[in-house]
Design a protein with these regions (language model features):
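Conserved beta-alpha-beta core of the PfkB/ribokinase-like small-molecule kinase fold
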Residues: 48, 52, 60-131, 151-153
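Conserved phosphate-binding/catalytic region of the ribokinase-like
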Residues: 96-101, 126-196
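Short, acidic/turn-prone active-site loops that include or flank metal/cofactor-
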Residues: 39-41, 92-94, 113-115, 167-170
C-alpha cells in the first residue's frame, strides 16, 4: 500500500464490525481503564492464520497480543516459532496461556499488572519485577521485559538482568493510552533493524 504496510492478509467481515475499545482516562494521573469489544478481531480463526502463514514465515519479527481468540493466537505463535521467527508477545489483556506457549516466546512484554497475573504476586518494586521475571524465565520465556510505567522497564533473560529508568519528560502525563503498544512497536522495529 502507499505507506508501506502489507495488507495482503486483510479480510473484511460482512457479519461483524471492527473492534472498538472504550477508554476511560483519569484526568489527574493520565492512567486509563480500557473496555474492549473485539468485533471481527474476536472472530479470527486458525484458517485465517493458515491463509497468512506464508507472511508469518517470511517475517523477521512476529508481534502479537491477546485480544484475538487465545487458541488462534497460540497457533500463530507456534507457526512463527517453528519457523525460527522471533516472537514478541504483549500479553494484553492477560489471559491464561498453555504451558508450552511460554517456551515459544522470545520476548514477553507485560506491564506490571499483566506480569502479576502470570506470577500471582503484585509487582510494586524492582525486586518484585526481578522475582517475576525469573518466574517467567522458569516457565520457558527467553527474554522478559516488564514495563513499569513512569518507573521504567525491567529486563531479564538467563544471562543478564537490569532495570532502566523511564525518560523524564518533565511534563504532565495526559493519557497513557497506547504506551504499551508504542513500546512494543519500537521494540519490534529495533529487533528487526538489528537483524539487517
Amino acid at each position: 500500500s502507499e505507506f508501506g504496510v502489507n495488507i495482503s492478509n486483510l479480510t473484511i467481515s460482512e457479519k461483524h464490525s471492527t473492534g472498538v475499545a472504550g477508554i476511560f482516562v483519569n484526568k489527574k494521573t493520565g492512567e486509563n481503564a480500557i473496555n474492549v469489544v473485539p468485533g471481527a478481531a474476536g472472530k479470527i480463526t486458525k484458517s485465517d492464520i493458515d491463509n497468512a502463514s506464508q507472511t508469518i514465515k517470511e517475517s523477521e519479527i512476529f508481534l502479537t497480543q491477546l485480544e484475538a481468540p487465545l487458541d488462534v493466537v497460540e497457533y500463530a505463535i507456534e507457526i512463527a516459532s517453528s519457523n525460527n521467527i522471533d516472537v514478541i508477545l504483549n500479553p494484553a489483556p492477560a489471559r491464561k496461556l498453555e504451558q508450552k506457549t511460554f517456551s515459544m516466546i522470545d520476548y514477553f512484554t507485560p506491564n506490571e499488572t499483566e506480569a502479576s497475573f502470570y506470577v500471582e504476586h503484585k509487582i510494586e518494586t524492582q525486586e518484585d519485577a526481578k522475582k517475576a521475571a525469573n518466574q517467567l524465565i522458569d516457565k520457558g520465556v527467553k527474554n522478559v521485559i516488564i514495563t513499569l510505567g513512569e518507573k521504567g522497564v525491567y529486563f531479564a533473560n538467563e544471562k543478564q538482568n537490569f532495570f532502566t529508568n523511564a525518560f523524564d519528560f518533565k511534563g504532565k502525563v495526559v493519557d497513557t493510552t497506547g504506551a504499551g503498544d508504542g513500546f512494543n512497536a519500537g521494540l519490534a522495529v529495533a529487533l528487526a533493524e538489528e537483524k539487517k
